[in-house]
Amino acid sequence: MRPPAGLPSLSRRSRILLVVAVVVAALLLVGPRLIGMYTDWLWFGEVGYRGVFTKVLLTRFVLFLVVGIVVGAIVWLAMLLAYRARPVFVPVSGPNDPIARYRTTVMSRLRLFGVIIPVAIGILSGLIAQANWVTIQLFLNGQPFGITDPQFNLDVGFYTFDLPFYRFVLNWLFVSILLAFVANLVTHYVFGGIKLAGRAGTFTTAARVQLAVIAGTFVLLKAVAYWFDRYSLMSSSRKEPTFTGPGFTDINAVLPAKLILLSIAVICALAFFASIFTRDLRIPAMAVALLVLSSVLVGAVYPMIVEQFSVKPNAAQKESTYIERNIEATRQAYGITEENVDYVDYPGVGTKQPQDVPADRTTIANTRLLDPTILSPTFTAQRQLKNFYGFPQTLNVDRYEQDGQLRDFVVAARELSPNNLSGNQTDWINKHTVYTHGNGFVAAQANEVTAVQGDSQNNTGGYPIYSVSDLTTTPENENLKVDNPRSYYGEVISQSDADYSIVGSVDGEGPREYDTDTSKYTYTGSGGVSIGNWFNRLAFAAKYTERNILFSSAIGSNSKIIFKRDPKERVEEVAPWLTTDGAAYPAVVDGKMQWIIDGYTTAQDYPYAQRSSLDGLVEDSIDQTTGRLIPRQEFSYIRNSVKATVDAYDGTVTLYQVDEQDPVLKAWMGVFPNTVKPKSEISDDLQAHFRYPEDMFKVQREMLAKYHVDDPSEFFTNNAFWSVPSDPTIDTSANQPPYYVLVGDKDTAKADFRLTSPMVGFSRELLSAYISVANDKENYGKFTVLQLPTDTQTQGPQQAQSAMTSDSRVASEVSLLKQSNKIQYGNLLTLPIAEGGILYVEPLYSQRNSQNAFPQLARVLVSFSDTNGIRIGYAPTVSEAISQIWPGAGSAATVTQPAPDPDTGAQPETPTTPTAPAPPASSDDVTKALAEVNSAMAALKSAQQSGDFTSYGAALDRLQKAVDAYQALPR
C-alpha cells in the first residue's frame, strides 16, 4: 500500500524569497513602532519623566513574558503529554484516510509544529495581556480607602485594586486550560489516541485521563469564579437606571445561588477526577449536565421569579435598604457628602432691594458681559497682529487682582497658528524654523466693554477692553505681565498635522525665528529634543517622513526639535493614569505663562456607587458646537486629585497633588514615585488661579440631581429629582454649561469666584435649585446648593429666555437687527440676588453680515420674577437694564468706557465715565416709532412684489426715515 504523501517542500530559491518577504513585512510592521518608541524615549528624557516611560514599558514587557510563557507552556505541555502517550501502532483505515496524511505531515516536521503552535499562542496571548498593565500596577501598589462595603465588610480598596487582578488571573487561566484542552484533544486525535468509529468513539486510557484532568481543572476554576462573582455583585447593574449595586434579588437570590453553583462545580470537578479511576465518563457527563441545569434554574430562573413575583409588586419597600446603600456610596464616590455640600433653603422670591444688600452690589458690579464662547473672532480681529497668530475657538475665564479688587477676565494666549500660514509662509523652512512660536497674553476684563451706543446698529462700541502683555506691550496691571511672552506650546499650535518646530542656533548664522517685524530670535529654553547628531535626525526624518530634516542646512549641532506641543497631550503622556479635563487654560503665574490642566483619578467597581461615563455626563452645548471628543470612560469613583502645569515657553510639565486623601492617587504615586509634587509646593500665585474644573462639576451636578434626596421612597419615585436645564441660547436640547461668575460673598460682600449651574425640576422648566462651588484657597471644592420650595414658581433658564425674547422692546429691535446682522445670545447667567430672588443676565451680540465682521455687545437683557410678576430689563448697559427693574440698583454696575478709535481698535489710556444719557423716550413714542417701522417694511415688501420701481424707491425711503426716527429716540 502506498504511504500517504506529505506536503510538498519548497525550493531553495522559494525559501530565500519567503524569508526576504517575511523580513520586509516585519520591518514595515515593527519599524515605525521602534522609531516611535525611540523618539518617545528621547521626549520623556527631555521632560524629565523617563522613569514613567521605562516603568510602563517594563511592566508591559514583563506581563507579555509571564502570560505568554504561562499560556504557551500549558499548551505545549498538553500537546507533549498527548504525543508521548500516543499508541505505538495506529492502523490506517484506508488509502484515503485524511488523518494519516496529517499525521505524516506532523511527524515530518514534529519540532516545528510542537514549538511554533505554543509559541504563536503564547505571543498572541502576551500581546493581548500586556495592555492590562494598569491592573497589575494598581494591585501591587493599592491603598486602603478606609471605607468598607455594607455587605461583606471589605475595604473598598479590595474592589478597586485587588478584585480586578484576581479576575485578570482567573480569565487567563480559563483561556490557558481551554486552549490546553483543545490542543490535547487534537493531538490525541491526530496520533490515534481518540478514534471516531460509527456513532461512538474510543479513547485510550491516556487520552481519557488527560482530558478528564484538564476538564476537571476547568470546572474547578469555574468554582473559584463563582466565589469571586459574589464580590462582583457589589457593582450589579440589575437595578439600573434606578440605582447601581445589588438589590433585594441579588442579595437574597443571586448571592445564595452563587454558593450553590460553587458547590455543584466542586462536585463536578471531583467527578472528572474520579473518572480517572472509575474509567467511566458517564459520571462527569452527568455532573456537567447538572451544573448546566443548575446554572439555568438556580442562577437565572429562581432570581427571575423572586424579582417578578416578590420584588416588583413591593419594589419601594423591598429595595429601600439597598437604595440607602446606593445613596451613601455614590455620595462618597463622587465627593458630594455632607462634608462637601451645604444645602440651604432658598425662597426663590426676593425680599430686599439689591442696593440694600452689600453682597448684591458686588454681584452687580461684577456681572460678566463677555462670553468666552463667542468672542474668539473679536479677539482675532482686534488683537491677532499677524495672520499666523490665532486664538482658540473657545476662550477662558480666570480672575486677577485689578486695582486691589478681584476681577474676572476673559483670557487667551496669542498662539502660533500653523494652519493660518499661507503662500511662501508654508515653505518647510518657514513653517518649521521661522514661524515657531506665539507672542503674548491677552486679557479683557469680563464686566467691561467700550461704550455701547443707544443706536443698536452703531458699530463703534461694545468691544472688549484689552490688557496685552507681549514683546512690544506691557500692561498696566502687573498681575497680567509676562516676563517672556513667547509661547512654544499651546492648544492652537498643536492643531496642525505635523506640529513640530526646529529651534536653536546654527554655527555661522544669526537668529532665524520670527519675533517682531524688526527682530528675530533664537530659542534658549530647555524644551525640545536634540537633533544635533545624525542618528536622531534620521529617526525624526523617518517619524515625520520628511527628508528636509536630514538635508537642511538650517539644522546644526545645537538644533532641537519641539514636538508634542498640546499641553493636555503632554500631561497625558507623563501621567497616563490621569483623565484630563476638557479645558486647558493659560494663566500668568509668577511672571510666567503657564497652562493649567486638571487631572482626574478614576476607578471602577466602587461598591454600590452609581456607574457613570464621561461622554454621557459632561457633554453640553459648548461641546456640541466645538465638536470636542469626550472619552467614553466608565467609572464609579472620581476625584480631581492633580493639577498640572505646562510652561508655555519651555514645555516643562509639573504635576501637583491637590487631594491628599485620594487612595487612587496614592497608589499611582507608589507606581511612579517622585512624579507628583506634594501640595505644599504649590505657590500662592499658582493657587490663586486654580479653578474648579468644569467636567468634574458637570459630573457632580448630575449626581446631585438625584443624590441630594435622602429618603429611599422619594428616591424611588423620582419626584424630588432635578435636571440640568437645556441651553436656551441654542436650537438644540443640549445641556446648559456651567459658568464661572464673580458674586458677592453673603458674609463679607467681597467678590467670590464660583462655578455655577441652575437646576430645574425633573421633566419641568421651573427652577428647583442653584448649585455653586467655591474656587478660593480656603473653601476650594465646597458646594453650596440653594434649594427652592417644591411649589416654587421661580422661572428657569428656558422660561427666562422666553420671557426676555418675547418682550415687545426686545422682539422688535432684534427683528430689526436681523435685517443686516447676525444675532447671538451670550451666556445666560443665573445670579442669586435680593435676599431670596434669582436674576438672569444675558448679553446680546450682533455681527454684521459681512466677511470681516466680528461680534460686538449690542444690548444686555435681564429678567427677574417675584410676586408682582416677571420684570424685564433691556438696555445698552447692565446698569441701565438693572435700573429698569430696580431704579437705582444699576448704579453698582461697572460703567462702560468710551469706544476706541475704529481705525486702530486701541483703547483710551485713561478710562472716562460717559456722559449721562438723555431721558428715555416714553413707551408711547417707542410704540409709535416701531409701528411706523413695521408699516414701512410691509410697504417695501408689497412694492417689491409688484415690480413697480417707483413705488419700491418710495417705500425704501419711507423705511429709512422710520428707522432713523426710531434710532433717534433717547434711551
Swiss-Prot record:
Species whose genome carries this gene: Rhodococcus erythropolis (strain PR4 / NBRC 100887)
TM stretches of this protein: 16-36, 61-81, 112-132, 172-192, 209-229, 257-277, 286-306
Annotated region (Disordered), positions in chain: 890-927
Family annotation (PANTHER family): UPF0182 PROTEIN SLL1060
Mode of membrane association: Multi-pass membrane protein
One term under GO cellular component: extracellular region
Pfam family membership, one: UPF0182
Taxonomic path: Bacteria, Bacillati, Actinomycetota, Actinomycetes, Mycobacteriales
Coiled-coil zones: none
Keywords: Cell membrane, Membrane, Transmembrane, Transmembrane helix
Name of the featured protein: UPF0182 protein RER_22310
Location(s), subcellular: Cell membrane
